[in-house]
Each structure stands twice: as structure tokens, then as C-alpha cells.
Amino acid sequence: GGVLAASDADNPALAFVPAAQDGAFGRLTVDAGGAWTYTLGAAAQALAGGEVRTEIFTVTLNDGSVTTATVIVTGTDDAPVISAATGTIVEDATPSIGGTLTARDADNPTLAFVPGAQNGAYGALTLAADGQWTYTPGPAAQALAGGQVVTETFTVTLTDGSTTTVTITVTGTDDAPVISSGTGTLVEDATDSVGGALTASDADNPSLAFVPGSQPGGYGTLVVGADGQWTYTPGPSAQGLAGGQVVTDRFTI
């Protein structure tokens, strides 16, 4: 602001006409004494750093004469306002999670995110130019134990080179092991034994194994190794079976 001056020996009542005027980048107000104030408006935020604009306002006095007030506006490089994001997902509860990042820069109305995909330790993040993001757990998340919590942070970039982050918390669940059963058929005195292999897998327990040992049954003995290999050998009681008689031995491993 400042003060405009006006004097007229023939008109001691000379004064400015109080008024407010809107310019392209702000508003000028003048009172009767010539005091003026210029207030920046929203449009000034769009000026790039170092960009210079001039506003000229015509000011009227009460005798009809006019003068001008000139204001020079210089823009500054406004920092962009960028959000970060967090997300939480439970293994196997949902296939993915997502959200929206926001970015605003008065000096750069075309500011956008750089789209792409990033692989993390437990999943992948995909990002669109408009800030839409999706996180999808990968196979490594299956190895998390029940209740185990891990966090991974992705850094995403905008077209002006600035960055922000997406932080994901992944909680593991107790995956049920996948275990096969086994069956075998044996004819008395035709073969000495019958065998096969049981399988077991558990994403939460890669060291899962069978408890080795032997179990007597009604008509023979089952032997199981830690790797699931099993052998059934008929015992003396099998000799008591009549021709064509069929019996079943069941074992819990």
C-alpha cells in the first residue's frame, strides 16, 4: 500500500473518491485521503517463480480528475501440496487394497503422478497418473505366520520430480497345511509289502515334516519316514484271512 497525494489551491476540498477495484491478480482499495491498499487474489498463486505482472488502476478525485496506481506483482515458486497414503491388508482376507494420492501445485496445473508398478517384499504397488493406487499381496505374503505384521513403503514420483510415499501394513494369517492321504492294496503272500509317499506343505512352516515311526495295525505294521515315505508289511494275523476275505487297516499319521 501507500498514499496518493493531490492538492489544488483553488479547491481545498479536493479528495479522492473512495473505491475498490478488482484487477487481474488482486484488488486495490483507495480512501478519501489517498491511502491505498493492494491485496493479492487467488489468481496470483498461479504465477510461476520470477514471473512479473503489472497492474495499473485508474483512481478518480472528487473534481473528476484522475491518476493511476501501478502495482508490480512478482510470482514465487509455490511448493506443491502432495498427500501420502497408508493402507492395511490381512493376508487372504482381500485380494488387494487401494486409494488415491492427491497433488496440487498452483504454479503447475498439469502436475500428475508418474504411472508405473513397483515390487515390494510382500506385494506390488501400481500407480496411475491421477494418483489411484492398488497394492496386491504376492506369494511371499503367504509365508507370514498368523498375526505376523510387516510394513513396506513405496516412494512414488510426480512429473515435477517431487515424491511422496505409500506405506502398506500386511498382517499374516495362519494358513492351514495341505496334507495328502495314502492308500494301498496288498494280496496276502503275493508281495512282501506295499508303500507310497505322503505329502505335506505349509506356507507358514517350510520345515513341516512327518513324525517318523511305526504303528501296528490289525493285520500288519506301517512304517513312516520324516519325508512321508511309508511302507506297510503284513503280519502273522494276515495269514488267518480266508481266501477272498477283504479287511482294512487304517493308520493316523
Q: Positions of the model-derived regions?
A:
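Glycine- and aspartate-rich repeat motifs characteristic of hemolysin/RTX-like Ca2+-binding segments
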Residues: 35, 79-85, 132, 176-181, ...
